[in-house]
Swiss-Prot record:
Pathway: Cofactor biosynthesis; coenzyme F420 biosynthesis. InterPro entries: CofC (IPR002835), Nucleotide-diphossugar_trans (IPR029044). Retains all activity when heated up to 90 degrees Celsius for 10 minutes and retained 38% activity after 10 minutes at 100 degrees Celsius. Belongs to the CofC family. One of its GO terms (biological process) is F420-0 metabolic process. The gene is cofC. HAMAP family: CofC. It comes from the Archaea. Keywords: GTP-binding, Nucleotide-binding, Nucleotidyltransferase, Transferase. This is 2-phospho-L-lactate guanylyltransferase. Its EC number is 2.7.7.68. It catalyses: (2S)-2-phospholactate + GTP + H(+) = (2S)-lactyl-2-diphospho-5'-guanosine + diphosphate. Homodimer. Pfam families: CofC (PF01983). It comes from Methanocaldococcus jannaschii (strain ATCC 43067 / DSM 2661 / JAL-1 / JCM 10045 / NBRC 100440).
Amino acid sequence: MNCGIKMKVIIPVSPINSLKTRLSEFLSGEERKNLLLNMLKDIIKALDGLDIVIVSRDEEILDFAKNELKAETIKEKYKGLNNAIKQAFEEIEDKEVIIIPADIPLIKKKHIEDILKLSKNYDLIIAPSRGGGTNLLYLKSKDLIEIKYEGFSFLKHLEEAKKRNLRYYIYDSFLISVDINTPEDLGEIFIHGNDTYTKNYLKSLGIDVEPKHSSAGRFVVKRR
C-alpha cells in the first residue's frame, strides 16, 4: 500500500449505550460492545499504513482507539453523524479523506489499495451499503461536497457529485456493503469472514449459522 499519500481515514463511532439496538435480543450490551471493538480491529487491519482518526463521544471507545488501535481520536462535541464528520474535517489538517463506518468488518486491505489507485483519477469514490447508505466515501478534498449521511445517503452523495460536476466512481463491493445491524447480518460474517476478529468473537459466544432451504432466507443464525 502506498503510505506516502497524505490522507486521513475518519471513522465515526456511536456511544456504547446506543450500539446496535437491533441486536439487543440476540446479544447483551457487553457482547454488543465487544462486537464493535472486534469490528474496529478488523477495519484497522485493512487500513494498515494509513493515518486514522476515530471520532466519538464515548470515553471508552476513545481510550480503546488510542491505546489498543493506536489511532488518533477526536472527542465529539455535537450529536449526529454528519456533525461528527464536519467536526473532524475542521480539526484535521489533511485535505484528502476517506470516511468509513465502524460496522463493516469484511473490508480488506485490497479494497483500500483499489481506492488509493482510483483516487489518482477521481474526485469522489463511493461504496454503497446494501440498504442504500454510504459505507465508504473518498473525497479528494474534504470541502468538495456537503456530507449527507443517514437515510439513502448513497444517492444523496451521488447527487452532490453530479451537481458539482465531480469525477466520481462507484466502487461496488459486496464485502464493503455488509454492515452489521441485525442477527441475520451476522450470518454474512460466518460465510465471508473466515480471517476476521469478528467471526472468532462470535464463535466464542456459541453463535453459528445453518443453511436455510426455503425462500424465506439463505441461512439461520443460532446461538447454542
